[in-house]
Amino acid sequence: MFTVRKERIEFIVKGSKVIGHLFIPEDGKVKKYPAVFIDGPMTSVKEQVTGVYAKSLAELGFITLTIDHRYFGESEGTPRQYEKFPDKLLDIKNALDFLKKRPQVDERFISLVGVCLGAGYVVAAASEISGIYRLAAIAGYYRDTQEMKANNLHDFNSKVSSGKKAREQYESTGKVLYIPAASLNEEAAMQTKDTVDYYTKRAAVQNYENSFAVMSREFFTKFDVQIYAEKVTRPFLMIHSQKALSPHWADRFYNNVRTEKSRHFVESRGQTDFYDNFRIINECVQHTSKHLLPVKS
């Protein structure tokens, strides 16, 4: 077990400052470490689930980085609370460039880990970035927009349309239309009991805002994670549970991955057990660390 030093870092993406936490294992003997960028659920910030996994993996000898994406937390960018996946992918690319410049990082062994929707973001980013060592997805939210359309095309199109209208309103007036990110009592982006409990109670950190820009729906609704399964080219680990989000989507994604892959199931009561239940987190971290350890030729 390594002693870990946490460093506040920043880099610029399209003129906006991105703030992150870099977790550095301190050994005194090792000069270069494998590195991991960890991405998390929609609207989340670095002090929540990604920070937990970042610290835990750093204790096992990985340099880890987690950030507040643009529009969230301490990072700059407007409008606030804007869940726009093309911009999140660009943030990930810049985060990897940041890691490559750190003298302690072994560039040969930089991996991506995603939790919940972060799993979708990292597999999408990896399809556009060369040099990724390995991928791991923990309790991933493998959105299948084709199934969503088949189940309720009107609802799908309505959400896209409402997002477009909200964006046009913002562009013409500067006014952003918001709904809660998590709530059981009103329209919200997330409406499951365990998710609401996590964001409004257990992980209601000062840096988190329980808010979601409706204009996000123009992009977020159309984000199809399933299309990236066949684009996965790096060794892939999936960790999931039958009680996590949409296990049948996880099965579909895994079955369509054509490269080296492995899967591990854990027992959970729901999705957010993966966020702050340390029995489950420790199990996930152990399997993830083994998957990401460098295999040197």
List the predicted regions and their residue ranges.
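Conserved alpha/beta-hydrolase
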Residues: S56-E76
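Catalytic nucleophile-loop/oxyanion-hole region of alpha/beta-hydrolase
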Residues: K46, F72-E107, S111, F278-E283
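Short beta-strand/loop motif that positions the catalytic acidic residue
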Residues: V232, M238-H240
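The serine-hydrolase catalytic nucleophile loop
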Residues: M42-K55, H69, A250
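Alpha/beta-hydrolase-fold enzymes
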Residues: V123-K201
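Short beta-strand element of the alpha/beta-hydrolase
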Residues: K31-P41
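N-terminal cap/lid segment of alpha/beta-hydrolase-fold proteins
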Residues: M1-K31
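Catalytic active-site module of serine/aspartate enzymes centered on a nucleophile-bearing elbow/loop
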Residues: E267-S297
